[in-house]
Amino acid sequence: HVSTQLAGGALLSTSWPNPSRDSNPLPEWKGFNLLDFFSPVPGSIKNKTTSLHLQWMADWGFDFIRLPMAYPHYLNFDRQRPIRPEDVRNIDERTTDQIEELVFQAHRYGLHVSLNLHRAPGYCINAGFEEPYHLWKDQAALEDFCFHWDFWAKRFRSVSASKISFDLLNEPAMRDDMNDQHAKNGPVPGATYRAVAEAATRAIRAHNPNNLVIADGNNVGNTVVPELMDLDIAQSCRGYNPGSISHYKAPWVVKDIDTMPMPKWPGQVGDRYLSRDLLETYYKPWIELSQQGVGVHCGECGCYNKTPHEVFLSWFDDVLDILHLHHIGFALWEFRGSFGVLDSGRADVAYVDWYGHKLDKKLLNLLRKNI
């Protein structure tokens, strides 16, 4: 067992205001996920972030990026075969230097960077890459998970918690077969999640006791993790509820996309009436968590490009309004791409030309509404 002194008072030792009944210990950061290192296969991401993109974000008033990384992206190993446990610590420093450069570029534009292991040794919410072990079950996977966080914490040990945070693991869930995209998920047992989060946090704070650590909600980011409340770890929720709107016709979520009913907001969809009340209920535990002194941020949110645009905006306006009323920041999933403000590929948007990109001005205005 690790004492809660492990934390070093990271969330409350900064210049941020102390939590009160109506405040959130974390700043209300707003911004985007950048997917430059999201794929386990280097070179497969076409939409690389440039300094100009970062400048646009800052000019539009945003102050946050989340960097979801797949650990195989920055390893040296034989990619003609599945990865082996002995490969998992073979860091390719040419690639990690690129990641570091993107972090420092973002800092030059006043953007906080939250590093995230979207694919960690032994776990990812997405299939498509064969893991050699299981993070929730195998000690070797846990040790390698901590190795990676030790590496990143050492890289950024002199960077202030106001500029960088460490988001441990994207969307934890218990899935028996991690190589089946549509296998049933459930919550990770609380004690198991605590043990993993505590070990990684210890590795991160060994380099700087004031490092800001964030843990995604359990059950694919949806539910508060009471088992972590005493560890001085912030928690990250999601802005994807209900999935019938956010992931309408998303093939990686639903096997038979043609069976999905047309989304409405508000309105009756299948056997449910969808309205703001549903969101108020969904976010209530997260709001209460922030009122109890645990920092809360919405690390991912948005809508796939098959949802009718006006339905998306109507729903998202409610999501963002609830978050803002309780001082909870957010990061849209993507800056450019099917969830993004640029080049989203929607069939029902009157795009504005923005230096050769297609800008969804209505979405941008909604995101900027409370900046």
Model-identified regions with their sequence ranges:
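N-terminal export signals
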Residues: 1-15
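Acidic/histidine-rich helix-loop elements
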Residues: 34-49, 78-91, 137, 244-278, ...
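Surface-exposed, active-site-proximal loop segments in enzymatic domains
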Residues: 41, 73-95, 121-140, 174-185, ...
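Short, acidic/polar
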Residues: 43-58, 145, 279-286, 316
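Catalytic domains of carbohydrate-active enzymes, especially glycoside hydrolases
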Residues: 49-72, 286-289, 326-329
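An active-site-proximal structural segment forming one wall of the substrate-binding cleft
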Residues: 54-63, 84-119, 123, 127-167, ...
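Active-site region of glycoside hydrolase catalytic domains
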Residues: 127, 135-274, 280-304, 325-331
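Aromatic-rich peripheral "rim/lid" segments of glycoside hydrolase catalytic domains that contact
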Residues: 308-371
